Structures are given as structure tokens and as C-alpha cells.
Amino acid sequence: MHAPVLVLSDSLKRESGSKVHHGNIQASKAVADIIRTTLGPRSMLKMLLDAGGGIVVTNDGNAILRELDVAHPAAKSMIELSRTQDEEVGDGTTSVIVLAGEMLHVAEAFLEKNYHPTVICRAYIKALEDSIAVLDKIAMSIDINDRSQVLGLVKSCIGTKFTSQFGDLIADLAIDATTTVGVDLGQGLREVDIKKYIKVEKVPGGQFEDSEVLKGVMFNKDVVAPGKMKRKIVNPRIILLDCPLEYKKGENQTNAELVREEDWEVLLKLEEEYIENICVQILKFKPDLVITEKGLSDLACHYFSKAGVSAIRRLRKTDNNRIAKACGAVIVNRPDELQESDIGTGAGLFEVKKIGDDFFSFIVDCKEPKACTVLLRGPSKDFINEVERNLQDAMSVARNIIKNPKLVPGGGATELTVSATLKQKSATIEGIEKWPYEAAAIAFEAIPRTLAQNCGVNVIRTMTALQGKHANGENAWTGIDGNTGAIADMKESKIWDSYNVKAQTFKTAIEAACMLLRIDDIVSGIKKKQAPGSGPSKPTIETEGDADNEQILPD
């Protein structure tokens, strides 16, 4: 007998075959079960304690999973799913996990019957293509200029969130903000950059009803010399700079030998003249407000206040970009390059207000702002954080609608229609792929079933009634009213989903399920390469062949 050959080192742990499939599916199901109860308007909240002892109370799928620390690699990739969904379309983070978990769950039976994973994946991909075709068939277009329709959609998105009691207000805020920053690219395309140009400023205190969308920008800064500079300017001329207004330090150290006392004064005078020069270049454009991202010396401050110009220093780059978009200014890198066209004249009002203990600067009433700020008020920090998460989702939905103005029914109606259509289609599929295809069709029912569970109605009775209504492929708009658990027409109840979100949910869930099914080996315990400077490494002995050519000394 030959001695067994060890290929992998002892420290490596290797699992393969059915054990891996089973482990992956169990891990994915566990993740899906954690957030299953947060789907729909009657969803539960989760309270998470982080390492620092802070508390997060939320029902946003992505926010919950982000806080979790999981060990299993498959569970990690499931969590990555909701993050992708959040970045792509901003909503549907819970649905995508529930759907992917269900897809894997129904695949388990086939793996036990020794179906090859590739066969299951092929059937799943076919089911995905057909489900997107069904979406295209039942989608209806809306007019994005009709505010009431867009409002209905955004409201049905927020209806599932913690702040649903303030649905109208958040929906209004989201639509106002996204329509403000929308830019027409021509050919019917619109670009809406939520991350860059919409800032959410959270200020605890006051009532939630005090929240508003500012047609402009606000930031947590005061003018440099509050006593001497104006804190309120109507129709200000604004100059934005990206350079320091203080004496430039030398790049490398220089020594100057001072022989007489006057030499010292000459040096100081040079510094003063340098700053005065910069200020004169700026002041000849008669600005009312100068904002710089870098420092501003006391001397420059003196010249500005003497000329009646307000100044703000050390502003964040992102805020500066927003101000530029809002008032039409151009950020300038050197004062001597300033032109009349760089000055922002689009703002109607600059003022500094005290909210709570902090001073905030407002540049508002802009004529055609392409950036805006959502000011959120509320009783506590936790409350405002949750409102912000919901607002981000609502803005994403509004953005999706502006980009692709198509709706599909909500309340699980879309999934039931897809499921019914795929079941009918599975009869025409030949060969072994028929069964996994049919299973995928059944898996789509996980969403309406979860909705019914969270409402507390009789799940079996409700699902049977719904399946009966959808079996003939008609009335695609029949679904569950998430608040009452009753079966209703989604068109009448105005429960809608964005086409983009649904399509992305299906694609992400099924592709992820296929990816996890294809994994048949998990090797753990692979050594990390030591990072530079992270600790003593063993001395390496170079032979002459290894040594770099430069290190070989000439004979």
C-alpha cells in the first residue's frame, strides 16, 4: 500500500460536495429568516447593539445586515447582496434576501436527488428571463410630471418603513429633492445624482413636521468674524475658492539671516503684502461672500470685514461642490484666475441661523438650484437616523421613476403573476430542467407569503385564494393589502413598485442563488500575506540567483 499523499497542509480545512451545498443553503436561509419579519407595512423592527454600546433600531434590510457579524462565507455573500441592491436601486433590500433564500431552499431537494447544480442553474436562468418578460408585459408607464402618481408610488415604498405615519411628508421631501437635482442629458434621459448633490442635514430638536427641502445648501459653519461680518445678505455675489488665503509657507526649509531690525519688518511686510495682494484680486469683483475650503488668515479676515464681505473658511469639498451647483458659481483654484463668470449670483439669500447650540449657514432661495439640502428635525437622534434611512430609500425610488417611469403592482401581486405564468410555462419545458424551473416558480411566492405572515392573517387560506385568482393568468393586479392582510386590487389601493427595483431584485436574487449553488468546495485557513510593517518577519536568505542585479557588487 502506498502512504497517503498530503497535498494540502494540515492547517487548511477543506469541505466539498454535498456538505458544502447543504451548509451554504442553511446559512443563506438563516440570513433570510433574520430579516423576513421586516418585509411589508406591518413589519417588525430590529434592535441592534453595536460593539460601542450604541443602539440601532431599524427595519431596513440593508441597515440590519450591515451591522451583523457573520462567520459563514455564504452568509457574507448574502449580506453583500442587500448592499448591492441598496447601491443600485436603493430599495428592495429585504425582498432580495428573502427571494434568494427561498430559491436556494427549493434547490436543496434537487441536490439531494443528485441533480447537477448546473442543471438547476440553467433552469433558474431560464426562469429569470421569463420573469423579466412577464414584468415587461404587466408594467404600466406613468407621467413623471404628474405629481400625484409619483407621490402614490413613493408613498407605497415608504409604507413599509418605520415612518409610514409620516408617509406624505417624507414622500414630498423625497420628490422635491430629486426633481431639484435632476439634470436633463438630452434624448429623453435624465441624470439624478442623489449621493453628490442632495445633502441630508440632521438637527435634533423641534418637530418632525419642521423638516423641509431647502432650495439651496446649508452647512454647519459660521462666518469667520461674527461681530464684524454680516450674517444676512440678500442676493449675495458668491466666490468659491479652493486655496488658502494665508501666507504660503516655503516648500522646504529656508534660512534667512537678519542683520538689522528693519530686515525683520521687511519680511513681515512681504507677508502682509502677499495677503493684501490676494484680497485685492478677490475684492475687485465686489463679492458679498467668500468661501474657501482651506485656511483664511486674520489679516485676510481684516481686509474682508473692512470691505463688508463675509467669509467662511475650511468648508468640506463636498459642500463646496453643492454650493457651486446651487448658485451657479465656479470653484477657483487661484485668486488671480478669477473671472466675472466664476461668481455665483443664483442665490437669493445668505444667512446664518442658530439652531440648538450650533450655527448653520444657509444659502437658499436659489433661482435654478441643481443641489439641495434636506433638513430633518425630530425628537431624538435615533429617530432622525431612521427617518434618514427611509428618506434615502424614498429618494432612490423617486430617482428610479425619473430614470425609468414604469410601475408594476406591489403587495406581492407581481410575484404571484410571475409565479402563475412560470408554472403554466413549465408544462412546455422538456427534460430534466422542468422540475427546477417549476420550483423556481413556486419560490417567487415567498414574497406574498411573507407579507401575509407579517399581517397576521391565515397564510394558507390567503395564499390559496390568491393562487386561485392568478391561476388563469388574469387580473395581474390582485395582491395583498399589506396593512390589513385582505386581498385587494393593487390599482385601486394604489400599491405600486418601481419596475427598476423589481427587475433588479429578481436578477440579483436568482444570479446570487446560482452562484452559491455552483460552489462545491470551501477551503479555509489560507494564510494571509503579512502586511508590510505589521510585525517581525523571518529573515530571508537570498542565494546568488535570487539577489537583484543591483545588489550584486561588481568584482
From Swiss-Prot:
This is T-complex protein 1 subunit gamma. Disruption phenotype: Embryonic lethal. The keyword Nucleotide-binding applies. Molecular chaperone; assists the folding of proteins upon ATP hydrolysis. Known to play a role, in vitro, in the folding of actin and tubulin. Gene3D superfamilies: GroEL (3.50.7.10), GroEL-like equatorial domain (1.10.560.10), TCP-1-like chaperonin intermediate domain (3.30.260.10). Keywords: ATP-binding, Chaperone, Cytoplasm, Nucleotide-binding. The lineage of its organism: Eukaryota, Viridiplantae, Streptophyta, Embryophyta, Tracheophyta. The keyword Nucleotide-binding applies. It is found in: Cytoplasm. Belongs to the TCP-1 chaperonin family.
